[in-house]
């Protein structure tokens, strides 16, 4: 059995953006019975509550409310909880797949722990978050540094965009990278122009 711990999305079922939808589709299309997914889920209530979602072992994490820094605490707590679970259940050679660079400034500590138990650390860097104008200069500097640190300590950087992979390769030549595009649902929709979701969407954007 190969155990894969997914850290960094808000959890399941998907209710938000790209990472959450990616995780939902990933577990929904699992084929091999030899793979078991463990997914951290952000909670405002408790830490350590487990529930099954489409065969994935989901567990809640309730980080302290620290404003924008809450996501950093969330990822750190999720990794620590996963490490305890791995030890408790005797899981061998786990894979950690971290979505985003949020905890990059602290990743050396966690990378050493993961690799000391024979684990593998994979990272999806998302986009160029540090360039977004909504962040103050200190936050942009933190995110840029986090991005750099992730490339140093991850076993593999997985980009879902060719441009991001090229940027990582050119900026951090020591990094180990690969490109895996998101899949596309080619099945034809059964919705019509009269269905409520379609009408709501038109109304929202008219």
Each predicted region: which residue ranges?
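N-terminal subdomain of nucleotide-sugar transferases
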Residues: 1-44, 89-91
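Short beta-strand scaffold positions
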Residues: 41, 73, 98, 158-159
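A short, charged, and often flexible helix/loop element on the N-terminal side
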Residues: 55-80, 133-139
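An aromatic- and histidine-rich active-site surface loop
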Residues: 72-83, 93-126
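A short acidic, helix-capping loop that chelates divalent metal ions and anchors anionic groups
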Residues: 129-134, 188
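Membrane-proximal helix-turn-helix segments that form the acceptor-binding/catalytic region
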Residues: 139-157
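Carbohydrate-associated surface elements
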Residues: 163, 183
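A short helix/loop element that forms part of the nucleotide-sugar donor recognition site in Leloir-type
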Residues: 190-206
């Amino acid at each position: 059995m190969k155990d894969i711990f997914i850290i960094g999305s808000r959890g399941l079922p998907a209710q938000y953006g790209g990472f959450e939808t990616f995780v939902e589709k990933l577990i929904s299309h699992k084929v091999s019975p030899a793979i078991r997914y463990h997914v951290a889920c952000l909670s405002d209530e408790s830490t350590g509550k487990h529930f099954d979602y489409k065969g994935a072992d989901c567990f809640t994490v309730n980080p302290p409310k620290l404003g924008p820094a809450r996501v950093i605490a969330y990822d750190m707590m999720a990794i620590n909880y996963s490490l305890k679970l791995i030890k408790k259940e005797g899981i061998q050679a786990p894979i950690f797949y971290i979505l985003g660079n949020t905890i990059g400034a602290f990743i050396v500590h966690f990378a050493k722990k993961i690799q000391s138990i024979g684990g593998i650390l994979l990272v999806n860097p998302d986009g160029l978050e540090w360039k977004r104008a909504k962040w103050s200069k200190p936050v942009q500097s933190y995110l840029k540094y986090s991005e750099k640190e992730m490339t140093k300590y991850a076993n593999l950087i997985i980009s879902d965009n060719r441009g991001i992979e090229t940027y990582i390769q050119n900026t951090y030549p020591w990094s180990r990278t690969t490109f895996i595009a998101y899949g596309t649902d080619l099945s034809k929709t059964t919705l019509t122009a009269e269905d409520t979701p379609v009408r709501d969407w038109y109304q929202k954007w008219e």
